[in-house]
C-alpha cells in the first residue's frame, strides 16, 4: 500500500490494480481500481509494470520470469538465494561479516538457550520467536522447516534498504527499528533514522558478492559481546517499513517508477495498524513513543482506524487518550 499511496500522490495518470496469490487473503482498498487473484502468468500479462511486494509473490515472479524489470531496475532470480536462510548465513560468514550461530535441527544446538527460530526458507509470515527450553522447541510445528539461531539480546534491529544493479548499490537508506510486531522480531512498529558506516560497508560487501540486482533490506542486530553488528538476513523483497524510506529518500521511487518529489526529513514514525495489533498492554508501555513520533503511518481512513480500537480490550481512559492523540495528529 505504501507504493500505491506514493504512485497516486506523485505519479501522473497511474491506474492501479491489486493482486493476491492463491491462498492469500484478498486486500481491497480504494487505491486499487480492482483486485485480482494471480493464478498464472496470464494474470499479469498486458501490464506496463508488475511489482510483487511480499515474499510469496516476489518468489513466484522470479521463478516464472527469471528476471523482471520495474522501470530501469531488474530483479534477478539469483536473488532467491537470500530466501534460503542457511545458505545466505554461510555465504555472509565466509565474507568475514559477523553472523549468529545457526543450526538446522534441534539436535545440533550446542549453545545455551534461548534460541531464536524462524523459517528455513522465506515464505512470508510463518512461525518465529524465542524458545527458552528444548521442551518448548519440541512443541513447535514443522520443526524441520525452521532454523535455530543464537539469540542476540536487545530489542533494536538495524536495517539498510537498498536498490542495486549487478552488485552495486545505487541508493540506500538506514533505519533503526525500536519496536516490532511481533515483539520478538517482525515488521516495524516504531522506527527512526539511523546511520552507521559499518552497516553500509557490510551490506555493500554482501551485495557485491551476490552480484545482486533488485531491491531489498539487509538487517542486523548489535551484539555487545562481539562489540559489532551481526547480520541477520536480507529480505530480497519490498520491506514492511518501506514508506519510511520513501519519506526520507526519493531516489527509491525515482528508480522504480520515474517519479520525482522532494523528500522530507522525517526522524521517526509509528505504524499505527501494527501498534494497535500489539495489544493494549504493550500499547500502554509505548505511549511515550506514540506521542513523540514525527509521523504516523496508517493504511485506513481515520474512521476505520478508530473503529479498530473497539476490537481489542483497552481501558476506557487509555482508549480515549489514544483516539484524541490520533485525531490531533491526523495529516502529519
Across the structure, where does each feature detected by a protein language model lie?
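ATP-binding N-terminal substructure of ATP-dependent carboxylate-amine bond-forming enzymes
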Residues: 1-74
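Short glycine-/acidic-enriched loop or helix-start segments at secondary-structure transitions
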Residues: 3-4, 60-63, 126-128, 158, ...
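Structural motif
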Residues: 48-49, 174, 230
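Active-site nucleotide/adenylate-binding loops and adjacent lid/helix of ATP-dependent enzymes
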Residues: 78-154, 164-168, 194-201, 328
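A short beta-strand motif that forms the metal-chelation/ATP-contact edge
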Residues: 116-118, 162, 227-237
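ATP-dependent carboxylate/phosphate-activation module, predominantly the ATP-grasp catalytic core
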Residues: 150-211, 235-258
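A short glycine-rich, hydrophobically flanked beta-strand micro-motif that places a catalytic Asp/Glu
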Residues: 213-225
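Peripheral (often C-terminal) accessory segments that flank ATP-dependent C-N-forming ligase machineries
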Residues: 258-332
Amino acid at each position: 500500500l505504501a507504493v500505491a499511496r506514493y504512485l497516486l500522490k506523485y505519479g501522473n495518470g497511474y491506474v492501479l490494480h491489486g493482486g493476491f496469490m492463491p491462498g492469500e487473503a484478498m486486500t481491497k482498498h480504494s487505491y486499487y481500481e480492482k483486485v485480482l487473484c494471480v493464478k498464472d502468468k496470464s494474470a499479469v500479462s498486458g501490464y506496463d509494470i508488475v511489482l510483487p511486494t511480499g515474499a510469496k509473490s516476489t518468489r513466484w515472479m522470479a521463478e516464472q520470469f527469471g528476471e523482471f524489470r520495474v522501470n530501469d531496475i531488474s530483479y534477478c532470480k539469483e536473488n532467491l538465494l537470500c530466501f534460503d536462510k542457511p545458505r545466505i548465513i554461510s555465504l555472509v560468514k565466509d565474507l568475514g561479516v559477523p553472523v549468529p550461530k545457526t543450526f538446522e535441527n534441534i539436535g545440533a544446538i550446542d549453545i545455551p538457550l534461548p534460541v531464536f527460530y524462524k523459517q528455513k526458507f522465506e515464505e512470508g509470515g510463518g512461525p518465529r520467536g524465542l524458545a527458552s527450553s528444548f521442551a518448548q522447541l519440541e512443541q513447535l510445528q514443522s520443526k524441520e522447516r525452521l532454523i535455530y539461531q543464537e539469540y542476540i539480546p536487545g530489542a533494536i534491529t538495524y536495517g539498510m534498504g537498498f536498490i542495486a544493479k549487478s552488485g552495486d548499490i545505487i541508493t540506500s537508506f538506514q533505519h533503526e527499528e525500536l519496536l516490532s510486531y511481533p515483539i520478538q522480531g517482525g515488521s516495524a512498529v516504531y522506527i527512526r533514522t539511523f546511520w552507521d558506516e559499518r552497516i553500509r560497508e557490510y551490506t555493500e560487501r554482501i551485495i557485491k558478492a551476490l552480484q545482486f540486482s533488485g531491491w531489498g533490506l539487509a538487517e542486523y542486530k548489535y551484539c555487545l559481546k562481539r562489540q559489532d553488528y551481526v547480520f541477520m538476513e536480507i529480505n530480497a523483497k519490498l520491506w514492511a517499513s518501506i514508506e519510511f524510506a520513501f519519506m526520507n529518500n526519493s531516489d527509491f521511487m525515482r528508480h522504480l517508477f520515474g517519479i520525482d518529489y522532494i523528500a522530507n526529513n522525517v526522524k521517526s514514525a509509528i505504524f499505527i495498524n501494527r501498534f494497535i495489533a500489539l495489544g493494549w498492554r504493550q500499547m500502554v508501555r509505548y505511549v511515550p513513543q506514540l506521542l513523540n513520533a514525527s509521523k504516523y503511518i496508517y493504511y485506513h481512513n481515520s474512521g476505520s482506524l478508530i473503529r479498530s480500537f473497539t476490537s481489542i480490550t483497552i481501558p476506557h481512559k487509555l482508549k480515549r487518550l489514544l483516539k484524541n492523540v490520533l485525531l490531533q495528529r491526523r495529516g502529519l
